[in-house]
């Protein structure tokens, strides 16, 4: 008796339709976005000579700009540091109020989460512009903008970290009658300390980069000097400034990455 090879059933129709539909939606969104943004590969190709011509204006570098770069660069680092420090402190209560396992009232939890989502939806550059209008020009509006951004992001990351902890220590503390604060201090903080320290270092990296452009709206830092150079078409000094900022950010990233690798 000769046996015929088994015939595989055809693949289900619904998953195939879902896959085809997903690709169709993706393609439609791509074409619509390209149309409404006037995206054109031809225009990009035509701009390549201008791109190289722009960078050609930056050579040779004008190293005479170095003395006036130091103070604004230091101010930028101070804005990022203070913003990260105070933002981290401000985030602490929101971390625990926005976590399921540390908040007894779900209304409070969802209220805090909604508030944080609203705060995060506003770009830090817009916060800086608003603070400049309220507090006048200078580094203080930049610090306030970084504080708001840092607090909202760390609170979000922190609440998710708290919800992922081992519930055993919390249950043990509840069993012996520990209060809410004691449960957080002894059952939660030891489990999230290293991860949160890593997040803080990462946010500091982001804040250093963000602080370099806050000066464009008058919020202090090296961004103000960069805007001045560009306004006067001083591309050679602009190149020196960009090179210095790149080196500092690269150094901070390397140190922060090493520190975070030791924490986790």
Per-range role (PLM):
Residues 133, 208-245, 264:
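Glycine-rich helix-loop "coupling/hinge" segments at transmembrane-helix boundaries
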Residues 138-188, 194-203, 254:
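Membrane-cytosol interface at the C-terminal ends of specific transmembrane alpha-helices
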Residues 94-128, 157-160:
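Cytoplasmic-entry segments and transmembrane alpha-helices of multi-pass inner-membrane transporters
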Residues 1-85, 92-93, 97, 101, ...:
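N-terminal, non-cleaved signal-anchor transmembrane helix
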Residues 84-92, 96, 100, 125, ...:
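Hydrophobic positions within alpha-helical transmembrane segments of bacterial inner-membrane proteins
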């Amino acid at each position: 008796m000769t046996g015929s090879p088994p015939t595989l059933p055809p693949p289900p129709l619904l998953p195939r339709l879902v896959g085809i539909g997903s690709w169709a939606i993706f393609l439609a969104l791509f074409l619509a976005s390209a149309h409404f943004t006037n995206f054109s590969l031809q225009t990009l190709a035509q701009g390549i000579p201008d791109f190289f011509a722009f960078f050609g204006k930056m050579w040779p570098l004008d190293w005479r700009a170095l003395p006036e770069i130091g103070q604004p660069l230091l101010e930028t680092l101070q804005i990022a540091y203070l913003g990260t420090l105070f933002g981290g402190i401000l985030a602490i209560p929101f971390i625990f109020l926005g976590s399921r396992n540390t908040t007894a009232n779900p209304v409070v939890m969802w209220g805090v989460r909604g508030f944080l989502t609203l705060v995060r939806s506003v770009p830090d550059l817009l916060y800086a512009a608003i603070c400049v209008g309220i507090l006048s020009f200078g580094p203080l509006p930049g610090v306030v903008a970084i504080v708001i951004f840092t607090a909202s992001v760390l609170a979000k990351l922190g609440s998710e970290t708290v919800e992922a902890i081992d519930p055993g220590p919390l249950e043990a503390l509840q069993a012996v009658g520990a209060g809410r604060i004691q449960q957080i201090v002894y059952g939660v903080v030891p489990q999230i300390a290293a991860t949160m320290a890593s997040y803080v270092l990462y946010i500091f990296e982001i804040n250093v980069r963000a602080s370099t452009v806050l000066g464009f709206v008058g919020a202090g830092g090296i961004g103000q000097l960069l805007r001045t150079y560009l306004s006067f078409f001083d591309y050679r000094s602009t190149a020196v400034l960009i090179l210095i900022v790149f080196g500092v950010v690269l150094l901070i990233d390397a140190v922060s990455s090493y520190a975070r690798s030791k924490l986790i």
